[in-house]
Amino acid sequence: MAYFNQHQSMISKRYLTFFSKSKKKKPFSAGQLIGLILGPLLFLLTLLFFHPQDLPWEGVYVLAITLWIATWWITEAIPIAATSLLPIVLLPLGHILTPEQVSSEYGNDIIFLFLGGFILAIAMERWNLHTRVALTIINLIGASTSKILLGFMVATGFLSMFVSNTAAVMIMIPIGLAIIKEAHDLQEANTNQTSIQKFEKSLVLAIGYAGTIGGLGTLIGTPPLIILKGQYMQHFGHEISFAKWMIVGIPTVIVLLGITWLYLRYVAFRHDLKYLPGGQTLIKQKLDELGKMKYEEKVVQTIFVLASLLWITREFLLKKWEVTSSVADGTIAIFISILLFVIPAKNTEKHRRIIDWEVAKELPWGVLILFGGGLALAKGISESGLAKWLGEQLKSLNGVSPILIVIVITIFVLFLTEVTSNTATATMILPILATLSVAVGVHPLLLMAPAAMAANCAYMLPVGTPPNAIIFGSGKISIKQMASVGFWVNLISAIIIILVVYYVMPIVLGIDINQPLPLK
């Protein structure tokens, strides 16, 4: 266990170091300084010189705000969350929305859904339930190198549906490194060193990629999907339920995990090592060290199952009862969170209750503010007439094959998110796609869903996602190798996303992809 803890600490330090290298002591990097000046400059230039006859002044003003905010989001001139507070100042200043209207977007039901999801995830991490779940899955799948690789991917993918992708990978990487070290230490005379090295590279990448892929399974799995849910409701007044998205998302995750596993095992890192020395023994040892399931773990497990059942049954059961007919996914998330605050813990030396308010220090408030800022900006775009004007300009695309548009959007966003924040990318591009759907005469989810899913998928560069940074920080993989392997995983993801959105999603969600929805 000491080795496990030592490597978890080592990975954490490398992960933090990786993201702090460029900051040093300077207040702004060159790119940030350019963005800091360019954002307000674009705002002023738009107000002064951009005056189309068919766009009211309010629309010009919101376009100027959007350019400013988008520039600061892309360049991270100031923290992304701080940029997301600009609508609170700028929208009332231009008399687009009242302060009350803007502020209400930061308390949207979607934000509380994600807040509750975060609290549940932190409860799992606090009482170590996530580690037990991961080790149990790996132990059940098998002992061969192929099965160990698959086991790690399934465990990481499952965890990242409910805890952050970063947390899921941070849990699994030290376990993976411990298995690799054990294999090197117990290496037999007839074992090929090259095969072990190929296996360790495939295992490290498999954990990182599975952490990213798993986020597509549920609405709380990754920020772009929450943004999709919010923007879809904001622009069209329709809801994507937690349960229905799972029917779309989980098969997508299963297929993507399966194909990525086959690619890593039999194409990218093909080797002759059938069984890993000491692999299964180490997994069982880690499980034994956890001991019997503790009271607190059982409580969190029960609450987790309850939350899942409520989210899954809300659409076809809770909505039919008068008492619970107005319950939303966010309502369920907060109800579950309150239960965690109420139930006492037996291990009072550690914590008095399952969750206490110390959890506030661990919550990603910045992400929640970003969601609110995106929703506020989307409302401004709608109320100012900018959305309608953009739709008119995009009508020139009418007649272009919808599948071609989906392919272009998916590939564009997928490679864009390699160098930009996935949350910022989704927040910027989804309102544009909502308007584009009206212009080209297709259902908005045909364009918005692949963009949100693609925004989550970045496999080529360490800066693409936190999981990529973590696995790069392990020292087992080079940027060149990550880019080479990740490029093909990007293409695999693009193909699966396009097929799912075009052929599976319409059936599950009951939509006609050729039927546009009117903007609110």
Swiss-Prot record:
The gene is sdcS. InterPro entries: SLC13A/DASS. The keyword Transmembrane helix applies. One of its GO terms (biological process) is sodium ion transport. It is a multi-pass membrane protein. Keywords: Cell membrane, Ion transport, Membrane, Sodium, Sodium transport, Symport, Transmembrane, Transmembrane helix, Transport. The keyword Cell inner membrane does not apply. It holds the Pfam family Na_sulph_symp. It is found in: Cell membrane. Mediates the transport of the dicarboxylates fumarate, malate, and succinate across the cytoplasmic membrane via a Na(+)-electrochemical gradient. One of its GO terms (molecular function) is organic anion transmembrane transporter activity. This is Sodium-dependent dicarboxylate transporter SdcS. Belongs to the SLC13A/DASS transporter (TC 2.A.47) family. NADC subfamily. The chain crosses the membrane at residues 30-50, 55-75, 77-97, 104-124, 160-180, 207-227, 242-262, 298-318, 323-343, 362-382, 399-419, 428-448, 452-472, 491-511. One of its GO terms (cellular component) is plasma membrane.
